Amino acid sequence: MKLKVIDNLKEKTEPLSHSEAGKLVALIRRNTLDVHQGEYRLEDLERLVAFATPEKIQEEMNRGYLAMLFADDENLIGCVLVVRKGLKLVIKTLQVKMSFCRKGHGSLLYEQCENLFRLMGSNEMEVEVPKFPSSQAFYQSRGFVKTGNPTQKDLSFAMFKYI
């Protein structure tokens, strides 16, 4: 496994290439559709991944943090994107390719985030979570609680944790 990190939270130090942005978009969109097919209508799933275009991902990365997990030099199997919302940092998405789930890869990516939040001096974490039972369970097992702030017309909600 290979972990690649791009950290532009304090200042833009490294751009995200269009090619890498395309790989991220493909992972986010394919993963959301594969994992949650049947739980929501296709148009609802499309709304959940509307942020996943190469241009929007590149824009988020101008002041964001991205960790990408590769099985080899080319095979992207997971990612986590942290963005700024005002003064706060928020986990925008954490994705692991379905065939690599439940093998510790999501935990590895999450731990990158928790370490980042601590290094940035934050004592709290927030994440935007699609209303999928598996996503909610993942974060609850790490101490997050629902804040009750629905987003995207009730397709997702925020979860919060003190660190």
Question: Residue ranges of each PLM-predicted region?
Answer:
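Short acidic/polar active-site loop segments enriched in Thr and Asp
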Residues: 123, 145
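Glycine-centered loop/turn positions within well-structured domains
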Residues: 89, 103, 157
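Short beta-strand-to-coil "C-cap" segments at the C-terminal boundary of structured domains/repeats
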Residues: 160-163
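Conserved glycine-rich acetyl-CoA-binding loop
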Residues: 75, 93-111, 118-120, 130-137, ...
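Acetyl-CoA-dependent GNAT
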Residues: 3-11, 15-19, 26-93, 97-98, ...
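Short, solvent-exposed polar/charged micro-motifs at secondary-structure junctions
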Residues: 49, 157-158
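Conserved beta-strand-loop-alpha-helix junction that forms the acyl-donor binding cleft
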Residues: 126-136, 152-156
